[in-house]
Each structure stands twice: as structure tokens, then as C-alpha cells.
């Protein structure tokens, strides 16, 4: 339960997000069956969120906080750190495990 992080390509291994910093990422979100539900890459616009401000689901924040600058990783988020029993109507089914491909581009 929680978030599992699988490194696709390593980052610098030194620069990690700190609470209050803004993470700039590219991501693709998928259901376990591989169906894509969202992607910043499709919009050609990186996504920004602040660590510790609950601006994203818990699993996404917990996973990104453990990534170093430049790292690409696969985050597997169980429902308890995603959208839970409610899901996100029309997009995320109830009790869905979500998979995100994330690249930490910058910290502000």
C-alpha cells in the first residue's frame, strides 16, 4: 500500500524537493490497464505543484519528493494514496491503482 517508485533513468542523486518548493514535472497518468487519463506531455506544458501543500494526490507528492532533479520514474499509487473509494467520476474508477510516468524537470 502506498507509492512504489521504479527509476527509469537516474537524476543527479543530490537535489531533492524540499517542503514548500515547487516541483516542475512532466507526467503521464494511467490506469492499471494502461488507459491514459492525463498527460502534461500531451499539453506540451510542464505541471507545477508545491511540496507539502496537498495540491496533488498523496502518492504523487510522496513519490516526487523522493526523486532527484532530472530523474525519470514510474510511480505506482495504490488507492489509499490516490483517489480511494470515491475515484474521480468519469475519469478514475473507485479503488483504482494509478501509474504515473514522472520526470522531475526543475525545482523553484
UniProtKB/Swiss-Prot annotation:
Keyword Isomerase among record annotations: yes
Enzyme class: isomerase
EC code: 5.2.1.8
PROSITE patterns in the cross-refs: FKBP_PPIASE (PS50059)
Subcellular location(s) of the protein: Cytoplasm; Sarcoplasmic reticulum
Sequence ranges assigned to domain PPIase FKBP-type in this UniProt record: 20-108
Biological process annotations from GO: regulation of cardiac muscle contraction by regulation of the release of sequestered calcium ion; regulation of release of sequestered calcium ion into cytosol by sarcoplasmic reticulum; regulation of ryanodine-sensitive calcium-release channel activity
GO terms assigned for molecular function: peptidyl-prolyl cis-trans isomerase activity
Broad class of the protein's primary localization: cytoplasm
Activity regulation text: Inhibited by both FK506 and rapamycin.
Keyword Cytoplasm appears in the UniProt entry: yes
Highest rank taxon of the organism: Eukaryota
Keyword tags: Cytoplasm, Isomerase, Rotamase, Sarcoplasmic reticulum
Catalytic activity, reaction form: [protein]-peptidylproline (omega=180) = [protein]-peptidylproline (omega=0)
GO cellular component: intracellular membrane-bounded organelle; sarcoplasmic reticulum membrane; terminal cisterna
Family as reported in the entry's similarity comment: Belongs to the FKBP-type PPIase family. FKBP1 subfamily.
Function as written in the Swiss-Prot or TrEMBL entry: Has the potential to contribute to the immunosuppressive and toxic effects of FK506 and rapamycin. PPIases accelerate the folding of proteins. It catalyzes the cis-trans isomerization of proline imidic peptide bonds in oligopeptides.
Subunit description: Identified in a complex composed of RYR2, FKBP1B, PKA catalytic subunit, PRKAR2A, AKAP6, and the protein phosphatases PP2A and PP1. Interacts directly with RYR2.
Protein name in the entry: Peptidyl-prolyl cis-trans isomerase FKBP1B
Amino acid at each position: 500500500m502506498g507509492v512504489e517508485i521504479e527509476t527509469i533513468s537516474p537524476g543527479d542523486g543530490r537535489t531533492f524537493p524540499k517542503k514548500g518548493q515547487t516541483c516542475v514535472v512532466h507526467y503521464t497518468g494511467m490506469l492499471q490497464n494502461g488507459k491514459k487519463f492525463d498527460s502534461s506531455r500531451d499539453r506540451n506544458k510542464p505541471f507545477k505543484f508545491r511540496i507539502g501543500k496537498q495540491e496533488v494526490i498523496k502518492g504523487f507528492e510522496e513519490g516526487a519528493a523522493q526523486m532527484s532533479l532530472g530523474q525519470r520514474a514510474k510511480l505506482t499509487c495504490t488507492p489509499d494514496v490516490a483517489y480511494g473509494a470515491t475515484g474521480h467520476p468519469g475519469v478514475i474508477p473507485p479503488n483504482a491503482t494509478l501509474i504515473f510516468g514522472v520526470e522531475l524537470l526543475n525545482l523553484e
